[in-house]
Amino acid sequence: MYELQPQRVIELVLGSSLLASFGIVSLMSLVARRYAFPRILEGMIAGDFAGSRLSETCAELCKKMNITGVNLREATVGNAFCLDNKGRKVVAVSPELVSSMSPAEVEAVIAHELSHLKNKDSREKGLARLAKFAFVFDPVLHLVEAAVHRERELLADQSSVKYTQKPLALASALLKVHSAFHASLPGPGAGLFVGRKGKGLLSRYPDLDRRVQRLIDMAREMKTQTILA
């Protein structure tokens, strides 16, 4: 006669529950990307910058970075962000951000967002987020998801510097966006390029001081290399 083993039953139930949760979240993610994404996107962007100097800057960066099919649009939410869904690539920046920054700063911001597209960060962040929601009771995955997001932001900073050679422009842009947000000013401080204030393991954005210091260090290193060359 088969003997019931409580521990084995618990393992089977938990395993089945986790698989079911992961399957449901995966399905929801697929449906959202296919049907909800276009509507959400249209609510976050307005007209394009066709024919403007900004559009030319984006095109030049795309050529340098070997990225195709990018549409530069005005952001109606946040200050600057990028989205990639089934090959539809969008970089959006707010008119307020553009008007408050120098051309070099805007170029550095666009390069940062293009770097997310080039590095396929939507996929990396999406996988981390999917795991977090599928295993919602696992605190480690919440830390992992936040860590992945921070790491991809730092990588995008580094990539922006690689293609623009303007680390101080990016540092200045970060400080301007951060200042506008914490002064409760309208426009570019809405918080997608820098993110809300927060430190620690659960913060999805790197510490601002750390980001700026890294960029200053890059500028010093570039200056040293120029002198030695």
Give names to the regions the model predicted.
Residues 1-75, 79, 135, 142-143, ...:
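Hydrophobic or amphipathic, alpha-helical segments that drive membrane association/targeting
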Residues 37, 58, 93, 112, ...:
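Residue-level signature of catalytic and energy-coupling elements of molecular machines
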Residues 57-62, 150-166:
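An active-site-proximal "capping" alpha-helix that borders the catalytic cofactor pocket
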Residues 64-90, 141-143, 161-229:
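Active-site-proximal gating segments in proteases and membrane effectors
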Residues 93-108:
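Short pre-active-site segment immediately N-terminal to the catalytic Zn-binding motif
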Residues 110-118, 155, 159:
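Active-site His/Glu-centered metal-binding helix of metallohydrolases
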Residues 114-131, 168:
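Catalytic Zn2+-binding segment of zinc metalloproteases
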